[in-house]
Amino acid sequence: MNDSPKISVVVLAAGRSTRMGTSKLSLPWADTSVIGSVCQKFHANGVENIIVVLGGYAEEVHNALRRLEFYRNITIRVNADPIHTEMIDSMRIGLTGISNESSHVFIALGDNPQVSKEVITEMIDLRKSAPIIIPSFQMRRGHPWLVSRALLGSLLAVPAGKTMRDWLNEHAAEITYLKADRSVLMDLDTPQDYNADNLA
């Protein structure tokens, strides 16, 4: 895909899996792991600059990533204090690893392997329609998000106490929504979530 757009993805994978009780991102999923499945779908879409932010269970998740054929395309960043920081802090850490050539950056959840490769493809196709592309289901925002490089400065400047969703609300006029299925709202928090979705 030499003519593919230059896009990075920051995969947020620093959570502590408290409700799962184990390293959920390294659990089996399809022919790989939960985190592996997430990364595979971006790689299959030509996203070659993949930044994964680790935190809780960092070694287990890193080992799962090492088993991917395209591991050389993955940059590891670590949130050293996942207990006392928020998702937006992990995002900032991840953005330090994006390629200088990238025109857009996906912000993705490491525990959302349900999202299809096709949703990501459609988001990439829409990238020129607005600075922010968000998949939605029944009027609810989902993940991943696709953000133009031009907005990364304001995203990095979100003040303490504010969230990534606060930032989206402030930039509502710059969002194009992609209608998708409910998978864009899903994640894996409990053993019940994992068993239901992995066997579906």
What does each model-found stretch correspond to?
Residues 2-5, 159-200:
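Conserved alpha/beta core of the MobA/IspD/sugar-nucleotide pyrophosphorylase nucleotidyltransferase superfamily
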Residues 3-57:
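N-terminal glycine-rich phosphate-binding loop and ensuing alpha1 helix
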Residues 20, 61-65, 123, 155, ...:
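Hydrophobic packing residues within well-ordered alpha-helices of enzyme cores
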Residues 28, 114, 146, 187-188:
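Short aromatic/basic micro-patch
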Residues 30, 56-57, 82, 86, ...:
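Short beta->alpha linker loops
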Residues 35-104, 118:
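Conserved N-terminal catalytic core of the sugar/cofactor nucleotidyltransferase
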Residues 73-76, 132, 175:
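Short, conserved active-site loop motifs that form the nucleotide-linked donor/cofactor pocket
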Residues 83-149, 153-156:
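Conserved beta-loop-beta/alpha segment of the NTase-like Rossmann-fold superfamily
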